[in-house]
Regions:
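Conserved SAM/AdoMet-binding glycine-rich loop
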Residues: 13-134
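Short, small-residue-rich loop/turn micro-motifs
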Residues: 23-25, 85-89, 156-161, 221-223
Length: 228
């Protein structure tokens, strides 16, 4: 925590207004030093000159009620969570050795939406994982629709040497992987459009990040709506 605080204060001194917390499994932060992610964000919240903190990606099993509740109350931590889903099939999640199922994921999303109705929620989804039947893929599509995220990051499974998955039965044909990827990308576009439309006519503070070739400035609201 101390090292991260030093870095955050240093970027605040040079005028940074938003800090994005990123890393591999950031929800596991501090375990080796008897610290935790909640303790970190509470400390960061005290730095006066940083206006916004954004949590880049956090596993649903590590996104505790305490973290969600703290973000909901904070004036600095923005209402934006990117939460990996990977699949809406519990069988596939177990095969992927994920530490969560759809019930826990649903619980996390419900908690966020109850406390932060305008929160931007993004999801990672993998298509074409070995054993992903048509039925399993349909479960994923229906689960995503039920959760109503703001956007998806869609990844197409590809074989990697020296992994357990490459030796698994139930390989999904490449053409079917591409079809499923297209379906989810189209769904993501619909979800994003719906989220943006929901935020129309809202008064929000925008942090402008730069300008485009036509001279228009662009930036993002706290809940990650791009504004020009």
């Amino acid at each position: 925590i101390e090292k991260t605080m030093i870095e955050a204060k240093a970027v605040a001194k040079i005028g940074a207004k938003e800090v994005v917390l990123t890393g591999v499994n950031i929800g596991d932060f501090g375990k080796e030093k008897n610290e935790n992610f909640l303790g970190l964000i509470k400390e960061l919240d005290s730095i006066v000159d940083i206006e916004r903190y954004r949590i880049s990606s956090i596993e649903p099993n590590l996104l505790t009620d305490s973290i969600i509740e703290f973000v909901a109350k904070s004036d600095k931590f923005v209402p934006h969570f990117h939460i990996p889903l990977q699949s809406g099939s519990d069988e596939l999640l177990q095969s992927m050795r994920r530490r969560y199922g759809t019930a826990l994921y649903r619980n996390r999303i419900s908690k966020i939406k109850m406390l932060m109705p305008d929160c931007c929620i993004g999801m990672d989804v993998i298509v074409g994982y070995p054993g992903e039947t048509d039925s399993a893929f349909l479960k994923t599509v229906e689960f995503i629709k039920e959760m109503e995220p703001a956007y998806l990051h869609v990844f197409t499974y590809s074989e990697r040497n020296n992994t357990t998955a490459v030796r698994m039965a139930g390989s999904v044909p490449i053409i079917k992987r591409k079809e499923r990827s297209k379906i989810l990308r189209l769904l993501s576009a619909k979800l994003k459009r719906a989220f943006y439309e929901k935020n129309q006519q809202q008064h929000e503070v925008v942090l402008f990040e730069g300008s485009e070739e036509n001279g228009m400035m662009f930036g993002f609201t706290s809940n990650y709506v791009k504004v020009k």
